[in-house]
Amino acid sequence: MKAIIVLLMVVTSNADRICTGITSSNSPHVVKTATQGEVNVTGVIPLTTTPTKSHFANLKGTKTRGKLCPNCLNCTDLDVALARPMCIGTIPSAKASILHEVRPVTSGCFPIMHDRTKIRQLPNLLRGYENIRLSTHNVINAERAPGGPYRLGTSGSCPNVTSKSGFFATMAWAVPRDNKTATNPLTVEVPYICTKGEDQITVWGFHSDNKNQMNKLYGDSNPQKFTSSVNGVTTHYVSQIGGFPNQTEDGGLPQSGRIVVDYMVQKPGKTGTIVYQRGVLLPQKVWCASGRSKVIKGSLPLIGEADCLHEKYGGLNKSKPYYTGEHAKAIGNCPIWVKTPLKLANGTKYRPPAKLLKER
């Protein structure tokens, strides 16, 4: 606290005697106290700041992930999550991740019916893990799966390094080689193949088309039934036949069909089950993921470093312990949101100058 100088002047003369008491200058600082309401004080320290919007940044002291695969050029995060050819690369480990893509999330290779499953959530699911890797081996032998033998279908919109036609590495498009007939529901078990106790994210789906194409590919033009089961959760689907407008993906041929893609999360040692009919997209390479990465909505590119990442303001450096303005999710070493500004009184209570006393 600042010391108060008390000056007592006594002037004696033949004239009147004038006394002055405690004096201080006028104070513009007002603080609200719990017991006395608003009080004028001689000094305050501001404890709050009101941020302005800025670019997002890397979080100080941690690895921050923007795109799932920074080196996968011209690829959406869904492309990476489905392992589209030319979009397969290393996903860096990170303690914090930026959710930067807006809906609708798209992927090339083949038109996807996004709204029938939770597939749009797959990139965000992966983003929530600190460490993510794609398995080197396939989880099942798709060509010899029940109902086969199968040839593996491809799309001209999915060129890879060796061919002008390919498909997602996470799935195998199972097209019967010779036995193009209707089939009763078939069952395949999906084993756990991750090797480090990670969560296993297994992608699968099914293809449907108009009646002519369904007969040509599968020998059955009726709606097909599909089921996935894992960790006690079972999901059912029935394919839609026809009624799709032609759609072109990334300069490929117009497609009259659609694919529905879903995923299941297998905990260590847990086996999943897929029950299917014609048109199944059998799981192949799986994601093995571990650790936790904090996820926040933001935008790219990430420029520089910041103490805090805030969904509304971007990267913030903590100059005060509290902030006012828009309240939103934030991660890192962040100020605390308060509704009104806070001040710390570091002076004394203001006292007005004593009245002049005139004695006769």
Curated annotation (Swiss-Prot):
Pfam families: Hemagglutinin. GO terms for cellular component: host cell plasma membrane; membrane; viral envelope; virion membrane. Glycans are attached at residues 40, 74, 160, 179, 246, 317, 346. Gene3D superfamilies: 3.90.209.20, Hemagglutinin Chain A, Domain 2. The keyword Transmembrane applies. Binds to sialic acid-containing receptors on the cell surface, bringing about the attachment of the virus particle to the cell. Plays a major role in the determination of host range restriction and virulence. Class I viral fusion protein. Responsible for penetration of the virus into the cell cytoplasm by mediating the fusion of the membrane of the endocytosed virus particle with the endosomal membrane. Low pH in endosomes induce an irreversible conformational change in HA2, releasing the fusion hydrophobic peptide. Several trimers are required to form a competent fusion pore. This is Hemagglutinin. It comes from Influenza B virus (strain B/Bangkok/163/1990). The gene is HA.
